[in-house]
Amino acid sequence: MARPFAFLMVLVVISYWSTCSLGCDLPQTHNLRNKKILTLLAQMRRLSPLSCLKDRKDFGFPQEKVDAQQIQEAQAIPVLSELTQQILTLFTSKDSSAAWNATLLDSFCTGLHQLLNDLQGCLMQLVGMKELPLTQEDSQLAMKKYFHRITVYLREKKHSPCAWEVVRAEVWRALSSSVNLLARLSEEKE
């Protein structure tokens, strides 16, 4: 009788530990995918940023929502998922396809889709474990507003090559922030 009871206790402890730990396990390849996406986005550049200085704009990236020093994993994953989804939506629009090399754009969007799948799997783990913080909704709304400003800008500029170059550079900065955040979260787990 003692052995089945001990076995049941081990199962309960393992179950409790796996559901109460804050972390979620992103695949080892996630950081590599992030870096590859940044490389692809850099390769997509068609114009010198200097030739588009007149078109530059501050879109108000919500840096505090991805600040590696202030955010916890339970807050970070939903924000990073929203960021990735918004970038994917932006670059899969019909107006986007005319602006970029088709092969690079396809590879970039495929990589984003893989990242999004990783993040959404992680998000499902977090949702299953506990209630997510209320600040998550504020953070996701901040990301949506940020990308709305980008979309309006592109429309106002009639999706000009310079407008897309400004947006490409802006998205590169946003993705770089997300890579830094994920790196910090990975370090904390070790």
From Swiss-Prot:
It is found in: Secreted. Disulfide bonds join C24-C122, C52-C162. One of its GO terms (cellular component) is extracellular space. Keywords: Antiviral defense, Cytokine, Disulfide bond, Glycoprotein, Secreted, Signal. One of its GO terms (biological process) is defense response to virus. Its main location: secreted. Residues 1-23 form the signal peptide. The keyword Glycoprotein applies. SMART domains: IFabd. The keyword Disulfide bond applies. It comes from the Eukaryota. GO terms for molecular function: cytokine activity; cytokine receptor binding. It holds the Pfam family Interferon. CDD domains: IFab. InterPro entries: 4_helix_cytokine-like_core, Interferon_alpha/beta/delta. Glycans are attached at N101. Belongs to the alpha/beta interferon family. Produced by macrophages, IFN-alpha have antiviral activities. Interferon stimulates the production of two enzymes: a protein kinase and an oligoadenylate synthetase. This is Interferon alpha-9. The gene is Ifna9.
